[in-house]
Amino acid sequence: MSEDQGSGATRVKLVVVGDGAVGKTCLLICYAQNDFPVDYVPTVFENYTATRKRGNEDIKVHLWDTAGQEEYDRLRPLSYPGADVVLLCFSTISQSSYEAIRDKWAPEVNHYIPDVPSILVGTKIDLREQQHPDPNSGKFEPITADMGISMQKQIKAKKYLEVSAKTRQGLEEVFSAAIEIVLESRGMDKKSQDGSSSASGVPSGDKPTKGKAGKKKSGCIIL
């Protein structure tokens, strides 16, 4: 985390990892652009920027999206240097993505950036609530909140939070928690100038922008 050159805002670099199809990109687009995309646009890596207020202070959050597919395993670590916090994402309707947190994602993050705090995030909770057992394929067993907390303890993540990008349930809470963890780790957890002690979910006025490419992303790859 650092001061954004020329803006005076505090910079937070947030990296999101997890299996393909857990909804990482939709999560970032909904937070940064206040929009739930429906079109599929394949990408490997994308950056977004969102600015939030914390009292009188601007927090500029640089969001780094990564591909979860195995063929990008050698490229993905390029996203890690300079990270302040990591979101480890799994789908609450995918047992395999949940197990991959323990077997792949937490070990990978701990290898490349062992001192960076992480938050475990269970996505697609709107679909978890809609799922019903299929008598032809066996009983459907979604990932419960208790299972998420258990995994959080196993991998020593700072928090476990659940979210739906589509309904926005838990969306601001996830990113506000990430911001606060970073600020606390830098000794900036005291009350800010106007007495507020948490990052607001309301944009500070800057229109959120995407990082590398100049075009606004219109679609969502379910990474």
Swiss-Prot record:
Source organism, top-level taxon: Eukaryota
Subunit structure of this chain's protein: Interacts with rgaA.
Entry keyword Phosphoprotein: no
Membrane topology: Lipid-anchor
Gene: racE
Main location: membrane
Amino-acid positions noted as binding GTP in the UniProt annotation, renumbered to this chain: 18-25, 65-69, 123-126
PROSITE patterns noted in UniProt: RHO
Cellular component annotations (GO), alphabetically ordered: cell cortex; cell projection; cell trailing edge; cleavage furrow; cytoplasmic vesicle; cytoskeleton; lipid droplet; plasma membrane
InterPro entries associated with the record: P-loop_NTPase, Small_GTP-bd, Small_GTPase, Small_GTPase_Rho
GO biological process per UniProt: actin filament organization; asexual reproduction; biological process involved in interaction with symbiont; chemotaxis to cAMP; cortical cytoskeleton organization; establishment or maintenance of cell polarity; mitotic cytokinesis; polyphosphate-mediated signaling
Covalently attached lipid (S-geranylgeranyl cysteine), positions: 220
Biased composition (Basic residues): 210-223
Designated name of the protein: Rho-related protein racE
Region Disordered: start-end pairs: 187-223
Keyword annotations: Cell membrane, GTP-binding, Lipoprotein, Membrane, Methylation, Nucleotide-binding, Prenylation
Source species: Dictyostelium discoideum (Social amoeba)
Record GO terms (molecular function): GTP binding; GTPase activity; protein kinase binding; signaling adaptor activity
Subcellular location: Cell membrane
Function of the molecule: Specifically required for cytokinesis.
